[in-house]
Amino acid sequence: MVDDERVVSPETADDHEDSVEKSLRPQVLAQYIGQEPIKHELSVYIQAAKQREESLDHVLLYGPPGLGKTTLAMVIANEMGVQIRTTSGPAIEKPGDLVALLNELQPGDILFIDEIHRLPKIVEEMLYSAMEDFYIDIVVGQGPTAHPVHFPLPPFTLIGATTRAGLLSAPLRDRFGIVEHMAYYETTDLQEIVLRSADIFHTAIATEGAHEIALRSRGTPRIANRLLKRIRDFAEVAPDHDQIDLAIVDHALDLLRVDSAGLDATDIKLLETMIDYYNGGPVGLNTLAANIGEETETVAAMYEPYLLQRGYLKRTARGRVVTATGYQHLGRTMPDNN
């Protein structure tokens, strides 16, 4: 969950936002906007599996949060015409939890595990035989009466999603036959997503308004939809506005403190702290986090990725450094020693 004040967070804010996301989800690949190479590959794999009347190979989806990994898993289930059971790595605390999930699956069904990198080791190891040979062995009883019991499983598809693919063990990663990296979205795709969501919300929006929202959405559909939802409120109370136009978008996002590149107040504070107190860097992540009053993990997971992707920051062996692009965006002069 994310701080409600951070409108550009890629994480889900609360249960209400999660329910809104569900209402906006596409149901089939043809409705899914963006990620074209992945869609093309998956359409081939799905069609082939259906022709052979087999379950789809196991799928690993990895990439930054908010890009639609869960949505894509739902779409795959719809395209395959099977049921999907959803859970998360932290929710499967012990082998018995996994057994209960697997026991509910029918042939061809999908088990979706979000944050799969957070599975306990003992649960992960049980998955190996389930994924590879469709069986699990569990020990029943205790002490001298303990004995293994062999449980065959119906053929199923495991879809794992993670924002931290590097934390997956090699044995688990190697058991996924289909591995797809989800990248940040292009502005044109985000604009199309905003227009589609506005239509679902029954909200009139000008093309230039949708384009501006897309520009400030950090390449992330979840952020685009959240900004649209907030801006819709401004449009509905604004006099003499029958649609979300560019003026309303600019006004709303200025009040929300989201700048032209999608940076918010904390992003700006991070860059300005590095410039004002550390001459632009290099500065260590722990030091930087302490200076802006955030946890180190929060800075690494929530703030740094987008700043790196936009080229405002770079990593060096000695720490983080503000780039010339970062200085330029802030309207600051880069010192000669940088």
Swiss-Prot record:
SMART domains on file: AAA
Any single biological process term in GO: DNA recombination
UniProt-annotated binding residues for DNA: R315, R320
Main location: cytoplasm
Keyword Cytoplasm in record: yes
Gene3D superfamilies (alphabetical): 1.10.8.60, P-loop containing nucleotide triphosphate hydrolases, Winged helix-like DNA-binding domain superfamily/Winged helix DNA-binding domain
Region listing for Head domain (RuvB-H), in residue ranges: 260-338
Chain segments carrying region Small ATPAse domain (RuvB-S): 186-257
Positions of Mg(2+) binding: T70
Subcellular location: Cytoplasm
Entry keyword annotation includes Ribosomal protein: no
Binding site for ATP: L24, R25, G66, K69, T70, T71, E132, D133, F134, R175, Y185, R222
EC number(s) per entry: 3.6.4.-
Gene Ontology cellular-component terms listed: cytoplasm; Holliday junction resolvase complex
Region (Disordered): 1-22
Subunit field text: Homohexamer. Forms an RuvA(8)-RuvB(12)-Holliday junction (HJ) complex. HJ DNA is sandwiched between 2 RuvA tetramers; dsDNA enters through RuvA and exits via RuvB. An RuvB hexamer assembles on each DNA strand where it exits the tetramer. Each RuvB hexamer is contacted by two RuvA subunits (via domain III) on 2 adjacent RuvB subunits; this complex drives branch migration. In the full resolvosome a probable DNA-RuvA(4)-RuvB(12)-RuvC(2) complex forms which resolves the HJ.
UniProt function note: The RuvA-RuvB-RuvC complex processes Holliday junction (HJ) DNA during genetic recombination and DNA repair, while the RuvA-RuvB complex plays an important role in the rescue of blocked DNA replication forks via replication fork reversal (RFR). RuvA specifically binds to HJ cruciform DNA, conferring on it an open structure. The RuvB hexamer acts as an ATP-dependent pump, pulling dsDNA into and through the RuvAB complex. RuvB forms 2 homohexamers on either side of HJ DNA bound by 1 or 2 RuvA tetramers; 4 subunits per hexamer contact DNA at a time.
NCBIfam families reported for this sequence: PRK00080.1, ruvB
Domain free text: Has 3 domains, the large (RuvB-L) and small ATPase (RuvB-S) domains and the C-terminal head (RuvB-H) domain. The head domain binds DNA, while the ATPase domains jointly bind ATP, ADP or are empty depending on the state of the subunit in the translocation cycle. During a single DNA translocation step the structure of each domain remains the same, but their relative positions change.
Family the entry assigns: Belongs to the RuvB family.
Listed name of the protein: Holliday junction branch migration complex subunit RuvB
UniProt lineage: Bacteria, Bacillati, Bacillota, Bacilli, Lactobacillales
